[in-house]
Amino acid sequence: MLILASSSISRANLLKTAKIDFRQVSFDYDENLNKNISPFLYVQKIVLEKERQFLSTLGKDFQNQNLLFADSIVCIDEKILTKAKDKKEAYEMLALQNGKYASILSAFLLVKPEKRVFSLSKTTLYFKNFDENALRDYVENDLYKGKAGCIMCEGFHQNFITQQVGNLSTALGLDIQTLKAYL
């Protein structure tokens, strides 16, 4: 059995859909790291920091188990977009994507008793212009909350994607194809 060390509903749904036997363990992580580095390094450091925090607090309870740590960020060029703190920040992030593109970087660390596997994947989504009413509804109803870069591939953004380069599961927060290869 896999232990998903994350409160992400999206990641849990991806594992269920892939028929991977898992148990979800929610943990409140401090994700405040210096964002003045490349987005690729940033998401990797976040995953390693999640592992460190989880093991320092709950490590005794999960010895010799298969643990999965994951994180996703959105970047536009080299600008890192994490989770919006409020509606103003959500509107700013969405304005950067409107009629343009955004890349989702998803990293995971699979810790097994006999090995460690680290994976970094990228999916780029290209968008047509957002409908202003749909955008306002999305933000004003707080649907952006908890979403890296305010991106909701299975919701708001779905209607505006013109091209996708990479796996949908990566855009949703976990590269399932790669994970399955190492389970």
UniProtKB/Swiss-Prot annotation:
Any GO molecular function: nucleoside triphosphate diphosphatase activity
Alphabetical list of InterPro entries matching this protein: ITPase-like_fam (IPR029001), Maf-like (IPR003697)
Catalytic residue list: D71 (proton acceptor)
A Pfam family matched in the record: Maf
GO BP annotations listed: nucleotide metabolic process
GO cellular component term of the entry, any: cytoplasm
Catalysed reactions, as listed in the record: a ribonucleoside 5'-triphosphate + H2O = a ribonucleoside 5'-phosphate + diphosphate + H(+); a 2'-deoxyribonucleoside 5'-triphosphate + H2O = a 2'-deoxyribonucleoside 5'-phosphate + diphosphate + H(+)
Subcellular localization, as worded in the UniProt entry: Cytoplasm
Keyword Hydrolase among record annotations: yes
Annotated EC: 3.6.1.9
Primary enzyme class: hydrolase
UniProt entry tagged with the keyword Cell membrane: no
Superkingdom of the organism of origin: Bacteria
Disulphide bond pairs: none
Cofactor: a divalent metal cation
Keyword set, alphabetical order: Cytoplasm, Hydrolase, Nucleotide metabolism
Function text: Nucleoside triphosphate pyrophosphatase. May have a dual role in cell division arrest and in preventing the incorporation of modified nucleotides into cellular nucleic acids.
HAMAP family with a match to the protein in the record: Maf
Family to which this protein belongs: Belongs to the Maf family.
Cross-referenced NCBIfam families: maf, PRK04056.1
PANTHER family on file: BIFUNCTIONAL DTTP/UTP PYROPHOSPHATASE/METHYLTRANSFERASE PROTEIN-RELATED, BIFUNCTIONAL DTTP_UTP PYROPHOSPHATASE_METHYLTRANSFERASE PROTEIN-RELATED
Record-given protein name: Nucleoside triphosphate pyrophosphatase
UniProt organism field: Campylobacter jejuni subsp. jejuni serotype O:2 (strain ATCC 700819 / NCTC 11168)
